[in-house]
Amino acid sequence: MSLIATLRGWRAQKIAERVEELRKLVDLDPAVLGSFPFEMSGGQQQRVAIMRAAMMDPAVMLLDEPMAALDPLIRRSLQRELKSIFQRLGKTVLLVTHDLGEAVYLADAITLLHEGRVVQSGTYRDLLLHPADPFVTQFINAQRTLPDAAEIA
């Protein structure tokens, strides 16, 4: 996490202070900082990833599928925590996700891509009420419905 800061000439004390500030922000147990990734839970790994992304205080942060491979209960808990962290950071965060519910919960605006091109940008309400093309409708409808017991049987 501190490699880039070191390469940019930060003093060890400044790095340690920034790491501690970010550790508190993401509510990470201090004992985890010396761990290898395989020793961490999925939620701990995601917190460390957010710390790495925020280390150099960028104007914009990019998080690519930060909830991937997490079980649903941890995922929901981490989503709540991320929302709070994003607000406290006061940064623009670009979040890549295939989970529309996650995008709706975490984002102020959603940009839907299809085959490498932007299909529509706006709020969830905009996408829902004024879909730009049939793909937008299909994407939203596919994620709004779960199979019922009759469909599973």
Predicted ranges, named:
Residues 57:
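Conserved catalytic motifs of ABC-family nucleotide-binding domains
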Residues 13-31, 84:
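Conserved ABC ATPase "signature" region
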Residues 61-65:
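Catalytic Walker B motif of ABC-type/P-loop ATPase nucleotide-binding domains
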Residues 121-122, 130:
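ABC ATPase "signature
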Residues 36-40, 44:
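Conserved ABC ATPase signature
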Residues 50-51:
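Hydrophobic anchor residue at the start of the ABC signature
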